[in-house]
């Protein structure tokens, strides 16, 4: 029975370019949609730009245009980039739409009627110059824990501490530079802590859908269990769903000057995009996919592809909103990890913060990236590392050396010797290939989004096809008298196997598959076309080169095109009463500020005595485990062995949170030796207790990007003291 599925991807924010990190999730979603359609399932695939919020309003103001003009322009840019990478949405909408306003107001009204909305007075920082309340990320100042300057209002990027904006020292508005003042405002809250919501979410996050599949991957379900707690516990906080004017968004009905927070109407944008698409087509019953009762009776599915950074919103707030407003809840959340490049966080200084547009402008084939991302995807929340040398090797070996090579070695003989017409296929070869396919379970791997396993099995089949060609040597048969019939069979069989490989690769490489369909003069391939030998007498077209090899110089040019200079300005200290820069977050400006600070402090730092130095207990530490910290942009959780043991004599590693995520992939750290401060007082952080500090080097003047953890010389052992 055909499945009926509504698939969405997370809505990109209309305040910046699409980059390769974004594309991980969109490519994963597009592959799954293409596979489902090839299997004969009915799939509607929609997305939209997320267009509301303070950053949109301020960026438009800076550019001297209206927010509407900004989001219209970015909408075109985003859709262009997705199209260039083969992400084939049926419709790409905007959250700033009539459909989204109607849905947001309706859902809010139903939640209000069900007792899930309440108002409270809260105290917030207010910018007296811009006459606006400031979101946490638009307040900056000195960290209350370590004293680092130029830190955001919710967490410190230097020491990793989390705090309230009111705890910042010397706070200032990142919008105007003015000193903010505290003001009280009435806000609207969605009561996520309501026992009805807690009970529902505890069941929903741990349960299965109608098809018997878990709604959440195991890692996501475990995270929900941590956030929800056990039965009888209530760890959830209510959710502030309102913002004060001025704000770019939808005004809350009956609340002048109050607007829906962007995260309320953003996921509702899935429904709005689908409604616009359905009404434009005229043959889709929207309620069959959105209404709780009708969705159940019609057996429709709602599948969201999202990044793990927005799991909290999609696995808690979103299903609870839908449930208690009478809408269907998601069938499944497909959560992907972050992208690293060559084992490190994307970096503008290294040129690895690569935009989708620059990749296309530099002339690189987008299907190289689609293939590589698919090869690294396994259906879990693990991060994907784009190892550029590995991508070159994998594309050149798998796609050019194995797959395309089959057609390039055989097509010419069909054209020259047999007037472009195929002969009979070798029944034994095709039967052996079919048997190998059935054991590979490629379709199951695609359905489970384990694309890496699917591609490994497809390349194993490509090896079998190449082995068939190598064993029968058509280039030698062509030179031998009386072997034309055998040559015809061998080349025709090879092209039938090539057709099947193309079919299996089509969800990942739709553009290349279209070229092959044209070359073999075939209609669009469907999954059940496999094992139907191309008939004798079938005419194919002239072979055209299908894919070029990746050259290292192309990758180097791409990195150079994306490299942002971090050269600092002249080393002059800012005036004591100078206002901070208006725009926050620039790497260039951050480097300049760090350089200014260094210029002042290098000669002014007081000397310390040897006694002061010996108070610091520096130890050699072995990194026995390293993990990403969910919800932290900068931190890695380390387990460090410094020779300590528990009462039973077993190793007792220390837990330390280190702000080195921008420079290191956790997997590359395990087993390394480094240096830590062992007698630093334990500090309770948002993510757990930190029992020390790892030492790392960085360039104080900002000329060289990066962080570098210290490593001892050969022979040092865990627990040794550094003197």
Swiss-Prot record:
**Which residues constitute the signal peptide according to the record?**
none
Write one Pfam family the protein is assigned to.
Answer: tRNA_bind
Query: Which keywords appear in this protein's UniProt record, sorted alphabetically?
Result: Aminoacyl-tRNA synthetase, ATP-binding, Cytoplasm, Ligase, Metal-binding, Nucleotide-binding, Protein biosynthesis, RNA-binding, tRNA-binding, Zinc
Please list the residue ranges annotated as the tRNA-binding domain: 612-723
Query: Region (Disordered) spans which residues?
Result: 568-604
A molecular-function term among this protein's GO annotations: tRNA binding
Q: Which InterPro entries match?
A: aa-tRNA-synth_I_CS, Anticodon_Met, Met-tRNA-synth_bsu_C, Met-tRNA_ligase_1, Met-tRNA_synth, Methionyl/Leucyl_tRNA_Synth, MetRS_core, MetRS_Zn
Domain of life, source organism:
Bacteria
Spell out the reaction equation it catalyses.
tRNA(Met) + L-methionine + ATP = L-methionyl-tRNA(Met) + AMP + diphosphate
Per its UniProt record, the required cofactor names are: Zn(2+)
Q: What does this protein do?
A: Is required not only for elongation of protein synthesis but also for the initiation of all mRNA translation through initiator tRNA(fMet) aminoacylation.
Identification of the protein by name? Methionine--tRNA ligase
The record lists the lineage as:
Bacteria, Pseudomonadati, Pseudomonadota, Betaproteobacteria, Rhodocyclales
